[in-house]
């Protein structure tokens, strides 16, 4: 099936696990320092939100994760990385039998950051919070 995350931050069925520069983030297509800083700040803000609201557990919903993965795939349409004759680690085509999945969000860091801000502004919709 390939790597599946929600914005490279979180994975369904793994509550309270957060990461930076994971699959589904802008990753290697962005300047790492601002991308890492943005993701660390987002995760820290989310943890503060959880604590301020008396919550101790957060897990991304599988539906939200699936929607994000579809958005990652859609952002790659028309790029060389998604071309049928591209056999690269970018899409899993370098290993026969491996799932062809684009693990990098190609919509750009600005759009990625705007999406993350919107998520926070909407009380982290897409996460089950307890």
What spans do the regions from the language model cover?
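Central helical "cap/lid" subdomain
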Residues: 1-8
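Short glycine-/polar-rich loops that comprise or flank the Walker A/P-loop
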Residues: 14-16
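C-terminal, flexible cofactor-proximal segment of oxidoreductases
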Residues: 5, 18-130
């Amino acid at each position: 099936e390939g790597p599946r995350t929600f914005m490279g931050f979180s994975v369904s069925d793994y509550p309270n696990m957060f990461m930076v520069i994971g699959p589904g983030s802008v990753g290697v297509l962005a300047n790492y320092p601002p991308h890492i800083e943005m993701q660390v700040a987002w995760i820290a803000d989310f943890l503060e939100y959880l604590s301020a609201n008396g919550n101790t557990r957060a897990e991304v919903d599988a539906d939200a994760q699936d929607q994000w993965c579809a958005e990652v795939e859609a952002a790659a349409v028309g790029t060389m990385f998604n071309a049928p004759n591209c056999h690269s680690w970018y899409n899993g085509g370098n290993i026969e039998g491996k799932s062809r999945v684009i693990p990098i969000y190609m919509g750009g860091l600005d759009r990625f950051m705007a999406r993350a801000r919107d998520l926070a502004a909407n009380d982290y919709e897409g996460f089950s919070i307890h």
